[in-house]
From Swiss-Prot:
Residues 242-418 form the TR mART core domain. Keywords: Glycosyltransferase, GTPase activation, Nucleotidyltransferase, Secreted, Toxin, Transferase, Virulence. Its EC number is 2.4.2.31. The gene is exoT. The keyword Nucleotidyltransferase applies. It catalyses: L-arginyl-[protein] + NAD(+) = N(omega)-(ADP-D-ribosyl)-L-arginyl-[protein] + nicotinamide + H(+). One of its GO terms (cellular component) is extracellular region. This is Exoenzyme T.
Length: 457
């Protein structure tokens, strides 16, 4: 209700008050003057929705980020700029007043994500860049809408604006990747360290830089698939599956639709299948040596990590076996201590499989609950493989050589708690009979290997 009032001089108010004074029943009543503050409050009008102070402050905070989007649109192309107009509509956006500055920034960066596709497109010429063109055109490539500048700008946009953690991580790694000893991001700036390096580099060094940029673009192509799927609103799994098929071809495609009722998606089945079908050697070598994964390895690693995140622990402790030759991740771990393998850990329910892999090396018995049964996915289904995630902590319960000189080791998942590997019913028939030497005399061996309950046969 809007109340209108007028201000009168004091004498008029006093006269009016006396004129209307009287009694209301037993109560004496008279008119009093309305305080000025009450009159001002009654005359106040609310601003229309969206035009209040908080809304104006929110709009002011958002303005710089809108300017960034417009700048990105001009840099990466008009088509990319047009693609962001619908997402920026006022109807779809939450009220600016309800968001913090950080939330507004993140929202604007996410709205700008489609622009990055234009930048990745402009960078495509780097896939065929020669040493001669690099030396001649670096300034052009690293300025304006040049390929190197567009690539660096697009990767920053993906790193800061993608909702997909894997895409953000991959973009960040690419920006930091060394090209000729200089981070890729710096190659997108003319006049800096990269420009100086190009001027002083030998022809052989320039050729090596060009080769490294070609390798970068292989990874960029896979990242672009993921961003395109995100912009279209497609599931993350589809982008990963498309990337695996593009990289591995029929080798990956053979797993499509093979396990429709299983717990894992097509992309996860592809990754697990490719790993067990020979890719485990290259992937684990890179993981254990701390090397950067190539594009194909990174895709498999993403798919396998997603499968492990989805899988839950087994209801009961599972006993499996592993055979290795040479040194392994647990060789230097003392009994009672915890260690882990930086790579994925393949084990089998069949001790015979472990013996065939071990030879005269090491046979390990493992007790755990977090392993994934990949026997139905692997082309080597008869190996009855149980696969543990990379970095799974294992406690060494026992490590000793038997009478034949084979190292026998017992591990349990650290999350199980101490002595879970000694549970009755799980450990049976050690059967490590003492061997004999050439003279026929019994060989000495660690007495602990005689304890029943550790099936290391």
């Amino acid at each position: 209700m809007h109340i209108q009032s007028s201000q009168q001089n004091p004498s008029f108010v006093a006269e009016l008050s006396q004129a209307v004074a009287g009694r209301l029943g037993q109560v004496e009543a008279r008119q009093v003057a309305t305080p000025r503050e009450a009159q001002q409050l009654a005359q106040r009008q609310e601003a229309p929705k969206g035009e209040g102070l908080l809304s104006r402050l929110g709009a002011a905070l958002a303005r710089p980020f809108v300017a960034i989007i417009e700048w990105l649109g001009k840099l990466l192309g008009s088509r990319a700029h047009a693609a962001t107009q619908a997402p920026l509509s006022r109807q779809d956006a939450p009220p600016a007043a309800s968001l913090s500055a950080a939330e507004i920034k993140q929202m604007m960066l996410q709205k700008a994500l489609p622009l990055t596709l234009g930048g990745l497109g402009k960078a495509s010429e780097l896939a065929t860049l020669t040493a001669e063109r690099l030396a001649k055109d670096h300034t052009r490539l690293a300025s304006g809408d040049g390929a190197l500048r567009s690539l660096a700008t697009a990767l920053v946009g993906i790193r800061d604006g993608s909702r997909i953690e894997a895409s953000r991580t991959q973009a960040a790694r690419l920006l930091e990747q060394s090209v000729g000893g200089i981070a890729l991001q710096q190659w997108g700036t003319a006049g800096g360290a990269a420009s100086q390096h190009v001027l002083s580099a030998s022809p052989e060094q320039l050729r090596e830089i060009a080769v490294q940029l070609h390798a970068v673009m292989d990874k960029v192509a896979l990242l672009r698939h993921a961003v395109e799927s995100e912009v279209k609103g497609e599931p993350v799994d589809k982008a990963l599956a498309d990337g695996l098929v593009e990289h591995f071809g029929l080798e990956a495609e053979q797993y499509l639709g093979e396990h429709p009722d299983g717990p894992y998606s097509d992309a996860e089945v592809m990754a697990l299948g490719l790993y067990t079908n020979g890719e485990y050697q290259h992937l684990n070598r890179s993981l254990r040596q701390g090397r950067e994964l190539d594009a194909g390895q990174a895709l498999i690693d993403r798919g396998m990590s997603a499968a492990f995140e989805k899988s839950g622990p087994a209801e009961q402790v599972v006993k499996t076996f592993r055979g290795t030759q040479g040194r392994d991740a647990f060789e230097a771990v003392k009994e009672g201590q915890v260690g882990h393998d930086a790579g994925y850990l393949s084990t089998s329910r069949d001790p015979g499989v472990a013996r065939s892999f071990a030879g005269q090396g090491t046979i390990t018995t493992l007790f755990g609950r977090s392993g994934i049964d990949v026997s139905e996915i692997s082309i080597e289904g008869d190996e009855q493989e149980i696969l543990y995630d990379k970095g799974t902590d294992m406690r060494v319960l026992l490590s000793a050589k038997d009478g034949q000189g084979v190292t026998r080791r017992v591990l349990e998942e650290a999350t199980l708690g101490e002595r879970s590997g000694h549970g009755e019913g799980l450990l049976d028939a050690l059967d490590l009979a003492t061997g004999t030497d050439r003279s026929g005399k019994p060989q000495e061996q660690d007495l602990r290997l005689r304890m029943r309950g550790l099936d290391l046969a």
